[in-house]
């Protein structure tokens, strides 16, 4: 059985690797860490021009329809080059939620914009510093209006829409689609442990919202987590590969006692 990647998958991987190698070096990362910009806009625009945010989005919604394995290969390259862009929040979380649970009207309205990078999505779930459980959710929806506060929202200050986990009844949770540009939404940047990742506190005050399809919001959230975990694992794989490459290069270049230190192993 052949477990190798297809030619199309290899092509997308190699194009992503080439672009990131040429445009996402240490300078791009340092400009975000030391500057005012929340992410590397030129890198993000380049990724969008290549259609990479729409890798797994079906063609009928403006995406490439290339599937999640191809998206995993893109994620690996993003991790390898530490790309400071809102890819994980918009693609792994927001877009995945819309594709899995959104209504047809919601998909038609937002997936083409997300595929082109014209809009950025995120997921708002956490409310406390403790482990997230169904009982810890107090943000609620009544009569189509959302109220409450969400913490550590990835790229919350730059996203256009959010998929919000909220209480729809005393014993029920749901996922809701919210326009973060609505004036009833208050957003405050919060410093993250990883400065390459932007997070925000988001407060909703009678914010208009609509249900993201139907179903148990908690079970839907686990589905989103599972998909995102695989994609984040590929980012980590890319980061580990980059660290190994740096270690090997150092072992070849660093001399001790007249020999490269790698020769002592």
List each model region and its residues:
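Short secondary-structure junction/hinge motifs that connect adjacent elements
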Residues: 27-49
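Internal helix-loop-helix
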Residues: 48-108, 112, 116, 154-161
């Amino acid at each position: 059985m052949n477990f190798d990647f297809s030619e199309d998958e290899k092509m997308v991987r190699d194009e992503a690797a080439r672009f990131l190698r040429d445009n996402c070096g240490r300078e791009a990362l340092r400009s975000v860490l030391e500057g005012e910009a929340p992410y590397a806009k030129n890198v993000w625009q380049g990724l969008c021009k290549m259609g990479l945010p729409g890798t797994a989005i079906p063609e009928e919604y403006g995406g490439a329809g290339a599937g999640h394995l191809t998206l995993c290969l893109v994620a690996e390259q993003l991790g390898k080059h530490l790309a400071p862009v809102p890819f994980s929040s918009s693609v792994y979380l927001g877009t995945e939620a819309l594709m899995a649970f959104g209504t047809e009207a919601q998909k038609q309205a937002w997936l083409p914009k997300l595929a082109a990078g014209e809009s950025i999505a995120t997921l708002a779930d956490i409310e406390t510093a403790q482990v997230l459980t169904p009982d810890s959710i107090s943000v609620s929806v009544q009569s189509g209006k959302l109220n409450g506060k969400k913490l550590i929202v990835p790229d919350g200050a730059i996203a256009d829409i959010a998929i919000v986990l909220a209480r729809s009844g005393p014993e029920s949770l749901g996922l809701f689609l919210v326009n973060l540009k609505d004036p009833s939404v208050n957003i405050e940047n919060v410093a993250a442990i990883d400065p390459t990742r932007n997070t925000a506190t988001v407060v909703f005050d009678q914010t208009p919202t609509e249900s993201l399809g139907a179903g148990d919001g908690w079970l839907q959230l686990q589905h989103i987590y599972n998909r995102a975990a695989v994609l984040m694992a590929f980012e980590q794989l890319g980061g580990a590969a980059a660290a190994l490459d740096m270690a090997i290069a150092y072992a070849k270049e660093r001399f001790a006692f007249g020999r490269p230190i790698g020769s002592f192993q």
